[in-house]
C-alpha cells in the first residue's frame, strides 16, 4: 500500500512538473489601422518589411510562425489588419526584442512603395503581448 501511495505521488508530481515545463506557444498581436485610404502602401510595407523580418526569424529559429488577418474596419474596431507573431515557447518570446533588433539591423533600411513614411499610411491602434495559446479548451 505504501508503495502505491509513493507511485501515485510520483505520478502526480511528474504531471505537475510536466505542466510546469510545458513550453506553450505565446503570441503578440498588433491591431493596425490603414490611414487615409493608403491600402496599397500599407500592404506593400507589411509584405516587404514585416513579413520579410518574420521569414528571417523563422529561418533562424527565433519564432514559430506568423499570420496577417484582414478584417473590415468598424466604428467599434477601426483596425483592418491583425498581425500575429507566435513564439514556440517562453525562451523565444523573452528573446524577441534582441532577435528582432539583430534582424532589423541586418535587413537595413525600410522598403517603401513611395515617399510616404509608415506613419502616413498605418497606425498600430493597440497591441497585445504575452498572448498564451489554449490547448483542447484547457488553459495551460
Show which residues each predicted segment covers.
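Bacterial Sec-dependent N-terminal signal peptides
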Residues: 1-23
Amino acid at each position: 500500500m505504501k508503495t502505491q501511495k509513493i507511485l501515485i505521488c510520483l505520478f502526480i508530481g511528474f504531471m505537475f512538473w510536466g505542466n510546469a515545463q510545458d513550453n506553450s506557444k505565446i503570441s503578440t498581436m498588433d491591431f493596425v489601422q490603414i490611414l487615409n485610404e493608403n491600402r496599397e502602401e500599407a500592404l506593400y510595407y507589411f509584405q516587404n518589411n514585416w513579413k520579410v523580418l518574420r521569414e528571417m526569424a523563422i529561418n533562424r529559429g527565433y519564432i514559430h510562425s506568423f499570420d496577417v488577418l484582414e478584417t473590415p474596419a468598424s466604428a467599434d474596431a477601426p483596425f483592418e489588419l491583425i498581425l500575429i507573431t507566435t513564439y514556440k515557447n517562453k525562451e523565444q518570446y523573452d528573446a524577441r526584442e534582441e532577435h528582432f533588433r539583430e534582424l532589423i539591423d541586418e535587413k537595413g533600411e525600410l522598403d517603401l512603395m513611395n515617399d510616404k513614411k509608415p506613419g502616413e499610411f498605418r497606425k498600430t491602434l493597440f497591441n497585445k503581448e504575452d498572448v498564451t495559446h489554449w490547448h483542447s479548451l484547457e488553459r495551460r
